[in-house]
Design a protein with these regions (language model features):
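Non-catalytic terminal accessory segments
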Residues: 1-145
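Generic short alpha-helical hydrophobic face used as a protein-protein interaction/packing hotspot
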Residues: 81-84, 126-127, 159, 197, ...
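Generic detector of isolated residues embedded in canonical secondary-structure elements
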Residues: 76-79, 121, 154, 231, ...
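Generic structural microfeature
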Residues: 72-75, 117, 150, 358, ...
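N-terminal signal-anchor transmembrane helix
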Residues: 103-117, 121-126, 141-171, 178-191
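Soluble catalytic domains of enzymes that build or remodel membrane lipids, polysaccharides, and related
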Residues: 160-398
Length: 398
């Protein structure tokens, strides 16, 4: 998160947090509630400013010994903002219910007593709501940032030559090396792929968000590129263009990473002498409308597949999973994507699915598979029921 996007995120979450707190103070009939709301608002403002300062000036202290402490402080600030913001719908409903009860018609002492007793019972239960929400958010932030799961996929294809049965592709995506995950996390992810005996590593975009960490990423790739028999291949994501795409490109090339941009290459596996398959990758499409995106996706896919030998098994790297459709139409065997982060929150999946037809995991159209990586990293560390992911694809012949 950077620039105006970060500012907008902080304004919305901070504003929602203050409204949530104000609603809870109203429900509780808190004494001096205006003073409490003011203090809460000031604390929230300080937290929002602190998070923005951390993210926007990270480059100036990322190599200091106290950086981990600042990272934990920023995560605690996000915990506060996200927790109280998430309570806003419940706070609004609760305020409406209490308002109606307080201002509705009263008929006698018995009803007043009943309302007061019900309110006290409600308040005792309501206290647990912010506490519970805070615990869930804290878990989502800490677990989401600390844990990465290795998913192993065994995929069978009619188009894969029998001599290539057992070929292994490691897949990482959306690392977002930056204020919450560093180059050391990238290194550990690559080590995990190596330990699974992958022949090749593919990276489907959004590598780094903090340009000050790009040299460290380069050092990681330079050290580990030779550990893959058939190399490392990379396609651009949208975040490469949000920052300094040329800087990232230069780093990757100098480190021995192969960049494919609407082009492909014949791979001759070292472990399978005399065999070959085709790896291609598309650029990211910034088309604004669905129709324009579909046309550009089809165009980029055709460009990427130019020069593909007839009937050769083909793997396509595309940051956005909606490239699956033109790839399947073009007879690609396997599409590897990312971009969606899997929705990050399991209960947000139905909403995220409205935007992304292919949200996470494995999909199939005819003889074409598409796998959408949930993200090996993230720019917002909150994850619940949708952990970070490293994927190991083992290819088999039907």
């Amino acid at each position: 998160m950077k620039g105006w996007f970060l500012v907008l995120f902080l304004i919305i979450t901070a504003g929602g947090s203050v409204l949530s707190a104000a609603a809870f103070f109203y429900i509780a009939k808190s004494q001096s509630k205006f003073v409490k709301i003011l203090v809460f608002a000031l604390c929230t403002l300080v937290i929002a400013i602190g998070v923005r300062f951390y993210e926007e000036t990270y480059y100036s202290f990322y190599d200091m010994s106290y950086i981990k402490g600042l990272q934990y402080a920023a995560m605690a600030g996000l915990d506060w903002l996200i927790t109280w913001f998430a309570l806003l719908p419940l706070a609004i409903v609760g305020t409406a219910v209490v308002f109606i009860k307080r201002h509705g018609k009263r008929s006698g002492v018995h009803k007043v007593h009943s309302v007061d007793t019900g309110r006290r019972r409600f308040l005792k239960r309501a206290v647990l709501v912010p506490v519970g929400a805070g615990l869930v958010t804290t878990f989502g932030l800490t677990d989401g940032n600390a844990r990465v799961v290795t998913e192993r996929q065994s995929l069978s294809f009619k188009s894969l030559p029998a001599e290539l049965d057992g070929y292994i592709i490691g897949h990482i995506s959306d690392m977002h090396v930056g204020v919450f995950l560093g180059a050391d996390d990238l290194g550990r992810a690559i080590d995990e792929v190596v330990e699974n005996n992958a022949d090749m590593l593919v990276i489907t975009g959004d590598l780094a968000d903090e340009m000050c960490l790009v040299p460290e990423c380069g050092a990681v790739f330079s050290e580990k590129a030779s550990r893959f028999r058939d190399g490392i291949y990379f396609c651009y994501g949208n975040h490469e263009y949000f920052h300094d795409v040329q800087y990232v490109t230069t780093m990757l090339k100098n480190a021995g990473v192969h960049i494919l941009r609407n082009e492909g290459v014949v791979i001759r596996p070292q472990r399978f002498p005399g065999q070959a398959f085709f790896v291609a990758a598309t650029d990211y499409s910034f088309a604004k409308t669905k129709g324009a995106f579909e046309r550009q996706a089809e165009k980029f896919t055709k460009q990427a597949l130019q020069g593909r030998p007839q009937d050769m098994f083909t793997v396509l790297l595309a940051h956005h999973p909606d490239f699956f459709d033109p790839a399947a139409a073009a007879g690609v065997s396997l599409v590897l994507s990312g971009h969606t982060h899997g929705g990050q929150l399991i209960f947000a999946a139905p909403v995220a699915s409205l935007k992304y037809a292919y949200l996470r995991g494995l999909y199939r159209q005819g003889d074409t598979y598409c796998y959408v990586n949930r993200g090996t990293g993230h720019w917002l560390p909150l994850r619940i029921g949708c952990s970070r992911e490293i994927t190991i694809h083992t290819l088999h012949t039907v």
